[in-house]
Amino acid sequence: MKKDIHPKYEEITASCSCGNVMKIRSTVGHDLNLDVCSKCHPFFTGKQRDVATGGRVDRFNKRFNIPGSK
């Protein structure tokens, strides 16, 4: 194996905008500032909302009164 070809793998701090701070290991080489993390992302917190945008199929089913449509 060749020596000194791999990037330096070191511990860095990842700080989220919600205030959560995590120590992780990475080859980035500097601390990270995150917008969202598992503590504040709606998918992980259970505060996500369902977006029912409908669409062309729903509009078609409504227009022609297709059985089984919503």
Swiss-Prot record:
Cofactor: binding comment: Binds 1 zinc ion per subunit. Only 1 ligand appears to be Cys, the other are thought to be His and either backbone amides or solvent.
Tagged with keyword Zinc: yes
RNA-binding is among the record's keywords: yes
Record note on modification: Proteolytically cleaved by protease VII to yield a peptide lacking residues 63-70. It is not clear if this is due to protein degradation or is a bona fide processing event in the strain used in PubMed:339950 and PubMed:10556732. In strains B, D10, MRE-600 and Q13 the only protein seen in PubMed:10556732 was full-length; the last 7 amino acids were sequenced only for strain MRE-600.
Positions of modified residues (N6-acetyllysine): K8
Superkingdom of the source species: Bacteria
Record-level Gene Ontology MF annotations: rRNA binding; structural constituent of ribosome; zinc ion binding
Record Pfam families: Ribosomal_L31
InterPro entries to which the protein is assigned, alphabetical: Ribosomal_bL28/bL31-like_sf, Ribosomal_bL31, Ribosomal_bL31_A, Ribosomal_bL31_sf
Gene Ontology, cellular component aspect: cytoplasm; cytosol; cytosolic large ribosomal subunit
Residues reported in the UniProt entry to bind Zn(2+): C16
Cofactor(s) this protein requires: Zn(2+)
Gene Ontology terms describing biological process: cytoplasmic translation; negative regulation of cytoplasmic translational initiation; translation; translational initiation
Keywords carried by this UniProt record: Acetylation, Metal-binding, Ribonucleoprotein, Ribosomal protein, RNA-binding, rRNA-binding, Zinc
Functional note: Binds the 23S rRNA.
Family: Belongs to the bacterial ribosomal protein bL31 family. Type A subfamily.
Subunit structure: Part of the 50S ribosomal subunit.
Protein name, as recorded: Large ribosomal subunit protein bL31
